[in-house]
């Protein structure tokens, strides 16, 4: 495989990201690639050994994710972001997800090896809440609009309760603090 973009350049000086971009550009928009196929094409073009590719694979995958010119298309397929308009990217991903959800999968009956026909034993696997579509009905809460008269009556009742505990007359009295008593108590505690 030859890439026209790199004609006359030393292959050993090229990065895997540059080669990946060139390979995807050469293949065109409708030819997204699986990650493994992309890595194999890069290895073939650069002529690197399996061990060298394995060593640089984590860095390449990180670069592929962080480089803004690549886009994951699901199922480990990759393409160039320039191929897709922003709205089209969402549509492409959504259609892939819809294809997966098309046929519901049957759940297999779980077999418990410790329940040898014992009818009195409790099978806790049957109690899995994920197995049932359970929706708890929540009662709708209705709130009345705030009524200023209600608030006023609440404040008045609160004030009357406070006045029963401490009459307003007692609140106006000045309180005298005797500092000598405090000093004597501190001296007694130290002894």
Swiss-Prot record:
Residues 117-136, 142-191 have a biased composition (Acidic residues). GO terms for biological process: DNA-templated transcription; regulation of DNA-templated transcription. Residues 117-191 are annotated as: Disordered. GO terms for cellular component: DNA-directed RNA polymerase complex. It comes from the Bacteria. Residues 14-83 form the HTH HARE-type domain. One of its GO terms (molecular function) is DNA-directed RNA polymerase activity. Pfam families: HARE-HTH. The keyword Translocase does not apply. InterPro entries: Asxl_HARE-HTH, RNAP_delta_N_dom_sf, RpoE. Keywords: DNA-directed RNA polymerase, Nucleotidyltransferase, Transcription, Transferase. RNAP is composed of a core of 2 alpha, a beta and a beta' subunits. The core is associated with a delta subunit and one of several sigma factors. Belongs to the RpoE family. Participates in both the initiation and recycling phases of transcription. In the presence of the delta subunit, RNAP displays an increased specificity of transcription, a decreased affinity for nucleic acids, and an increased efficiency of RNA synthesis because of enhanced recycling. This is Probable DNA-directed RNA polymerase subunit delta. The lineage of its organism: Bacteria, Bacillati, Bacillota, Bacilli, Lactobacillales.
């Amino acid at each position: 495989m030859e890439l026209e973009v790199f004609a006359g350049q030393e292959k050993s000086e090229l990065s895997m990201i540059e080669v990946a971009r060139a390979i995807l550009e050469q293949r065109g928009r409708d030819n997204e690639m699986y990650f493994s196929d992309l890595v194999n094409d890069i290895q073939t073009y650069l002529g690197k050994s399996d061990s060298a590719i394995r060593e640089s694979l984590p860095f390449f995958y990180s670069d592929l994710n962080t480089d803004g010119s690549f886009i994951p298309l699901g199922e480990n397929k990759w393409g160039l972001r320039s191929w897709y308009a922003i709205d089209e990217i969402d549509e492409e991903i959504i259609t892939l997800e819809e294809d997966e959800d098309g046929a519901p999968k049957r759940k297999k009956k779980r077999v418990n090896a410790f329940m040898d026909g014992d009818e009195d034993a409790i099978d806790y696997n049957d109690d899995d809440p994920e197995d049932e579509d359970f929706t708890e009905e929540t009662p709708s809460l209705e709130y009345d609009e705030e009524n200023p008269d209600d608030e006023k009556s609440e404040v008045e009742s609160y004030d009357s309760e406070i006045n029963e505990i401490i009459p307003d007359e007692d609140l106006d009295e000045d309180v005298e603090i005797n500092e000598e008593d405090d000093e004597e108590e501190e001296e007694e505690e130290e002894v």
